[in-house]
């Protein structure tokens, strides 16, 4: 299918890199640690690919985005930030920082703002979100049985109804509001993760999500598993990751307060749901084994293709039961172009293992794709690449 690429050049503290773009189908993201890049910067990015539904049953396949600059502002007591998608209100701080976002052009509708990514004046950037489906054993609902060999058993006779241990909270934090809630209030990536953790502790989460925060020194990766359970992880310099719409973070020790921010019930909730994998006595939990549902083929194909693209010598296969979140690479010269290559990959690099997804019938979605760099050499310098793809 032919597509037209709409390219936007952005400046201020941002440098826009205008790049032609084809993106993989569905929401996917990547991180490349600063120890693996040519210029010593963190690289991360995400593609958003979602056919927005309308009330009349039709779908919008070319969903426009707008770039907004929100100036620093002083607020008086009683001023609020409203999440129109839920009706939840968040009191403004007395002073909030300048920040920029790329948001849906329908941001004034009752669906919410949906500022998908942005920077603030302190050099903190974020992307929100890679949507992930919580495990039914935890949040409640139906889920298929899984055979001993890992196969998901199909058919209604193989569905199990689970009670809710920690259900999602309808009025909790959403993708629609999270960027506008976090960016104007923080000075570092860790502060961003801590603030979101605090909001989830107090209000809960309405969705399963994955969010990335970065500043000039650090990058934090956060997974939200249920109404109140989450883990944020300080990303190492010498690894890379590719993650579509499910949870991939593996073994962590929640007692490692320097590198881990974990909800208080992260182990106890999993135990109550009967899904805990780890060693509670040591504070260890395998998060993917505990909180991730069975790996869908669409997620498997994207993570496999991304890993092999960035490291062709990797020994992962399409049949692997799971994929490690932190991947190794012999390269130390990755650039923003490598991030672009991940995003425009359609499996054509897999030597026929998978059909290129633009050849699959029914492929008809819009994509917002962007890459960000956190440059450690300059606290006020953010590099930003953005391309929006629309149907011809």
Model-derived segments and spans:
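Long, well-ordered mid-to-C-terminal structural blocks that present hydrophobic/aromatic surfaces
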Residues: 337-392
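Bacterial N-terminal signal peptides that target proteins for export
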Residues: 2-10
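Short, charged, surface-exposed loops that flank catalytic or proteolytic processing sites
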Residues: 185-190
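A contiguous strand-loop segment
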Residues: 27-174, 195-349, 354-360
């Amino acid at each position: 299918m032919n597509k037209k690429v709409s390219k936007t050049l952005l400046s201020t503290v941002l440098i826009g890199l205008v790049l032609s773009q084809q993106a993989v189908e569905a929401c996917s993201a990547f991180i490349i640690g600063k120890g693996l890049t040519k210029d010593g910067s963190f690289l991360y990015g995400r593609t958003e690919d979602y056919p927005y539904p309308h009330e009349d049953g039709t779908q919008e396949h070319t969903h426009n985005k707008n770039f907004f600059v929100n100036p620093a502002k002083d607020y008086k007591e009683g001023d609020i930030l409203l999440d129109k998608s839920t009706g939840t209100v968040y009191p403004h701080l007395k002073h909030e920082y300048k920040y920029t976002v790329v948001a849906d052009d329908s941001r004034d509708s009752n669906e919410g703002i949906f500022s998908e990514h942005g920077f603030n004046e302190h050099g903190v950037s974020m992307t929100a979100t890679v949507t992930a489906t919580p495990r039914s054993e935890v949040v409640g609902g139906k889920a298929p049985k899984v055979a001993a060999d890992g196969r998901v058993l199909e058919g209604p006779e193989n569905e199990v109804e689970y009670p809710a241990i920690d259900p999602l909270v309808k009025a909790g934090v959403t993708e629609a509001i999270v960027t506008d809630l976090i960016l104007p209030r923080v000075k570092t990536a860790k502060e961003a993760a801590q603030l979101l953790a605090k909001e989830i502790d107090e209000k809960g989460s309405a969705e399963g999500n994955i969010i990335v925060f970065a500043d000039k020194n650090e990058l934090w990766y956060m997974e939200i598993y249920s109404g109140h359970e989450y883990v944020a992880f300080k990303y190492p310099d010498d690894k890379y990751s590719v993650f579509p719409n499910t949870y991939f973070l593996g073994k962590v020790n929640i007692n490692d307060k320097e590198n881990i921010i974990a909800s208080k019930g992260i182990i106890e909730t999993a135990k109550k749901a009967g899904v805990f994998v780890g060693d509670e006595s040591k504070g260890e939990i395998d998060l993917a084994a505990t909180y991730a549902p069975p790996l869908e083929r669409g997620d498997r194909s994207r993570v496999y293709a991304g890993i092999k693209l960035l490291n062709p010598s990797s020994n992962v296969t399409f049949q692997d039961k799971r994929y490690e979140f932190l991947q190794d690479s012999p390269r130390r010269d990755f650039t923003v172009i490598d991030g672009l290559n991940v995003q425009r990959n359609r499996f054509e690099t897999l030597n026929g293992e998978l059909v290129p997804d633009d050849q699959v019938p029914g492929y008809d979605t819009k994509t917002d794709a962007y890459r960000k760099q956190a440059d450690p050499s300059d606290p006020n310098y953010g590099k930003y690449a953005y391309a929006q793809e629309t149907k011809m």
